[in-house]
């Protein structure tokens, strides 16, 4: 059983999200440790990206602040390595395919394994295109978290059957952010 799956041992999990490097990388490390103290079962760490198409204004602005502060993927890996000296809480990256592709799949997931990243969520990677990346991630003990958006029953069953770690349910169409209601 993976560390990500273990986070759901009580049937549900508290999973907060934060953008790495907002306002700076040192505070991100402190925030992760404080989130664990506050009861987090797993923490999503957003790797900032210049074009976060699935994100609403709050996370877009956090990404821009982080990038402006000089946050890089290497600095995030170093921060995670430091966090790992203090906690073993499951950590999952939330990022887009471009930064992972640019880093190189093998190099990226080797580094994830070295520093102790347990999973990854890539919202702009279609299920049908995750084959090569998924195989490399699995070889480095990194769960690729599947997303399920409103779709056909057959597609939901297919994605769910192949899921690892947990399933990220996209509850509404559009970008992330505050909603006055969620229509299902």
Give the residues covered by each predicted segment.
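N-terminal amphipathic alpha-helix/helix-capping segment at the start of soluble metabolic enzymes
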Residues: 1-17, 81-84
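Active-site mouth loops of central-metabolism enzymes
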Residues: 14-28, 92-104, 143-151, 179
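Conserved beta-strand positions in the central sheet of alpha/beta enzyme cores
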Residues: 15, 41-44, 121, 146, ...
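Conserved, mostly hydrophobic/aromatic
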Residues: 16, 35, 46, 112, ...
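Glycine-enriched alpha-helix->loop->beta-strand junction motifs that scaffold or abut catalytic
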Residues: 39, 112-118, 138-144, 161-168
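Active-site beta->alpha loop and helix N-cap motifs at the rims of alpha/beta catalytic domains
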Residues: 42-43, 47-49, 58-122
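Glycine/Thr-rich beta-alpha phosphate-binding loop at enzyme active sites
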Residues: 59-62, 69, 157-184
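Catalytic beta/alpha-barrel core
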Residues: 68-71, 116-129, 143-151, 157, ...
């Amino acid at each position: 059983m993976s560390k990500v799956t273990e986070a759901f041992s009580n049937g549900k999990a508290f999973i907060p999200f934060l953008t790495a490097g907002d306002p700076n990388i040192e505070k991100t490390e402190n925030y992760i440790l404080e989130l664990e103290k506050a009861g987090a079962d797993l923490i999503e760490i957003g790797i900032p990206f210049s074009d976060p198409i699935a994100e609403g204004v709050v996370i877009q602005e956090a990404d821009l602040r982080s990038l402006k502060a000089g946050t890089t993927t290497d600095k995030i890996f170093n921060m995670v390595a430091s966090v790992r000296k203090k906690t073993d809480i499951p950590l999952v990256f939330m990022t887009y395919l471009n930064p992972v592709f640019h880093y190189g799949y093998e190099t990226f997931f080797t580094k994830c394994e070295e520093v102790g990243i347990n999973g990854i969520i890539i919202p702009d990677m279609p299920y049908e295109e995750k084959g090569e990346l998924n195989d490399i991630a699995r070889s480095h003990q990194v769960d690729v978290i599947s997303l399920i958006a409103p779709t056909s029953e057959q597609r939901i069953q297919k994605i769910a059957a192949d899921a690892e770690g947990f399933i990220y349910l996209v509850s509404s169409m559009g970008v992330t952010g505050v909603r006055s209601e969620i229509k299902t």
